[in-house]
UniProtKB/Swiss-Prot annotation:
GO terms for biological process: ribosome biogenesis. Keywords: Cytoplasm, GTP-binding, Hydrolase, Magnesium, Metal-binding, Nucleotide-binding. Mg(2+) binds at residues 173, 193. SUPFAM superfamilies: Obg GTP-binding protein N-terminal domain, P-loop containing nucleoside triphosphate hydrolases. This is GTPase Obg. Pfam families: GTP1_OBG, MMR_HSR1. Its EC number is 3.6.5.-. It comes from Yersinia pestis. Residues 364-384 have a biased composition (Acidic residues).
Length: 390
């Protein structure tokens, strides 16, 4: 299945149903009073995180989602039926952004997590809501409010403990094949990896971690060169980054300058990502003499001003790979997992449209008190029906 990590969708919640103007009329009850019911609320739209999904390709073809409208109120104080909600399933790790405001609506980081992205309209009130001691035959009603409309951008971010970055042909795919059961394509030309891939590294029966491999970066990636930096977002949730450096580039370029390119592109993309724990890993030591490998490694360390520990491995021959993985496992065990973004729990307040309806009711009562007179005739059918619109 094709990997798609971005999709734009339109969500339109259902409108609220209108209130009803009706009067009870039965045999021997010619003037039964108002019995118009309220409308139904409009349907809401939710996102649901599903661990069985791993791509957003479905939403490249179906881009619009509209919830059902609430039914109008009916006579005999019958309330209209509520509109049906819509639930949209997305992969775990999906970030939801509002394209209109640019705000992050939510992060779907847990299986079964549910997020409301569009609220349905509130129901209109029937004329039975407006009856009072001075207005016993009201012809007022309110209309249902419109449902919320939003244009959303869905971004899928891989959930991994360890992320790898480096130039094309640095050996990232070879490394992930060596330490996990993942089988990304490996070849001797740049950009063999076109989409991110995940692998599970099992150290023993109880300990394991997830590693992510993304397409390689080149100089100018932040300006759109190569595959650009669109895949760097998949490293945002990683707890540690492995910066792989090829000690024996096939184009005979300077490994120190190559390493510097990656650091610069990382800083241009995001300061937060550049500040994540990053380990320096020198790969392909099997292609050159040990002394030459050590010499090149020290030159890179000096160029970058690197003060931490560095590793020298051969992913193809699996030299020193197991020791690196155990060090990564120990580091992850010593670092607490990043707290998942807390779901915002709204304060318990009255619904936003309650104030609107309360104002309409108060307005009608005030008008009725001003216009009240003793000559009011209940059988007068010449009254005017009044509809309040928001």
């Amino acid at each position: 299945m094709k990997f798609v990590d971005e999709a734009a969708i339109l969500v339109v919640a259902g409108d609220g149903g209108n209130g009803c103007v009706s009067f009870r009329r039965e045999k021997y009850i010619p003037n039964g009073g108002p019995d118009g019911g309220d409308g139904g609320d409009g349907g809401d739209i939710y996102l649901l995180a599903d661990e069985n999904l791993n791509t957003l390709i479905d939403y490249r073809f179906v881009k619009s989602f509209r919830a059902e409208r609430g039914q109008n109120g009916q006579s005999r104080d019958c309330t209209g039926k509520r509109g049906k909600d819509i639930t949209i399933k997305v992969p775990v790790g999906t970030r939801v952004l509002d394209q209109g405001t640019g705000e992050i609506v939510g992060d779907m980081v847990r299986h079964g997590q549910r997020l409301m992205v569009a609220k349905g309209g509130f129901h209109g009130l029937g004329n039975s809501r407006f009856k009072s001691s001075v207005n016993r035959a009201p012809r007022q009603k309110t209309m249902g409010t419109e449902g919320e409309t939003r244009e959303l951008m869905l971004e899928l971010l891989l959930l991994a403990d360890v992320g790898m970055l480096g130039l094309p042909n640095a050996g990232k795919s070879t490394f992930i094949r060596a330490v996990s059961a993942a089988k990304p394509k490996v070849a001797d030309y740049p950009f063999t990896t076109l989409i991110p891939s995940l692998g599970v590294v099992r150290m023993d029966y109880e300990q394991s971690f997830v590693i992510a491999d993304i397409p390689g970066l080149i100089e100018g990636a932040s300006d759109g060169a190569g595959l650009g930096i669109r895949f760097l977002k998949h490293l945002e949730r990683c707890r540690v980054l492995l910066h792989l450096v090829d000690l024996a580039p096939i184009d005979e370029s300077d490994p120190a300058e190559n390493a510097k390119v990656i650091v610069n592109e990382l800083q241009q993309y995001s300061e937060n990502l550049a500040e994540k724990p990053r380990w320096l890993v020198f790969n392909k030591i099997d292609l050159i003499d040990p002394e030459e490998a050590e010499k090149r490694a020290k030159a890179i360390v000096e160029t970058l001003g690197w003060e931490g520990k560095y590793y020298m491995i051969s992913a193809a021959n699996r030299d020193n790979v197991n020791a690196l993985c155990w060090d990564v496992m120990s580091f992850l065990n010593s670092q607490p997992k990043a707290m998942a973004i807390a779901e915002s729990v709204p304060e318990k307040v009255e619904f936003m449209w309650d104030d609107y309806h309360r104002e309409q009711l108060a307005e009608v009562e005030a008008e009725a008190e001003d216009d009240w007179d003793d000559d009011w005739d209940e059988e007068d059918d010449d009254g005017v029906e009044i509809i309040y619109e928001r």
